[in-house]
């Protein structure tokens, strides 16, 4: 079962992966100006956030992780965009508003001890997530689609996310990005996280009925992230998101609530890697 300490260590690993994956193409393709070498500023810092223990949970976990990335990430100014634990994007293509690249991350586990109604259903192992994204930027608008597939741990199926972002330049030192989105889940994903097999129903201590969800859209969400430069070196990040389960996900006997909230805050320090 993954708790705060273990999840924090995974965050460290993800942060390290960001550095390594950014460094490799920089040396190989002589694109150090894009990825943050040769004196371009980088940022080091940490995030603390509150997130549901599992999809459909009423209870929440408080987690934290450090990061290091090129300055400007999350503002369209970096080749790396950290959107979530399972959604760290690496922009490899950028042309006339179009951009695309691979993504990586981690999908956390769900333990049957996380909630009374999960007792008897068994654990779901987390694992490494890989995929790709593509998007098109028109002025302050950014339209994107991404695919996420877990390749280690349990085979939990694939997930497609669609999002529309709008960037607001509130002042020379403050940026706000608002977004709306939805996620389409494969039948394997839906069965893993929202389904109840006949065997699980028989073993369920809560007496959950058998439930066989189909592939489809599982949620809709709205969120905002503020980036505030406190001074030339220090930057504050504030983020919040609300999502609601829909379709078969909302009808699942596994969930405790259709509503989920996510909130986080971070602080970073800017420095020059090479002077």
Model region roles, listed by residue range:
Residues 28-77:
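Short glycine/proline- and aromatic-enriched beta-strand/turn motifs that initiate or cap beta-hairpins
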């Amino acid at each position: 079962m993954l708790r705060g300490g273990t999840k924090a260590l995974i965050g460290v690993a993800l942060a390290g992966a960001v550095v390594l994956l950014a460094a490799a193409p920089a040396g190989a393709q002589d694109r150090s100006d894009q990825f943050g070498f040769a004196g371009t500023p980088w940022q080091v810092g940490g995030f603390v956030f509150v997130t549901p223990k599992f999809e459909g949970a009423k209870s929440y976990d408080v987690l934290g992780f450090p990061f290091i990335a090129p300055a400007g990430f999350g503002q369209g100014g970096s080749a790396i965009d950290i959107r979530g634990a399972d959604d760290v994007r690496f922009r490899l293509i950028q042309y006339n508003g179009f951009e695309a690249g691979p993504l990586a991350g981690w999908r956390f586990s769900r333990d049957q001890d996380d909630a009374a109604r999960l007792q008897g259903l068994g654990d779901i192992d987390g694992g490494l997530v890989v995929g790709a994204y593509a998007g098109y930027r028109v002025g302050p608008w950014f339209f994107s689609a991404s695919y996420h597939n877990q390749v280690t741990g349990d085979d939990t199926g694939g997930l497609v996310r669609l999002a529309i972002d709008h960037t607001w330049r509130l002042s020379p030192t403050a940026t706000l990005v608002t977004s709306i989105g939805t996620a389409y889940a494969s039948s394997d994903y839906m069965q893993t996280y929202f389904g109840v097999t006949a065997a699980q129903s028989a073993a369920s201590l809560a007496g959950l009925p058998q439930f066989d969800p189909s592939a489809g859209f599982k949620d809709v969400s709205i969120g905002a992230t503020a980036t505030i430069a406190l001074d030339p070196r220090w930057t504050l990040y504030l983020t919040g998101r609300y999502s609601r389960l829909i379709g078969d996900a909302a009808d699942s006997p596994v969930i405790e609530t259709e509503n989920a909230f996510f909130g986080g805050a971070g602080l970073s320090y800017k420095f020059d890697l090479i002077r």
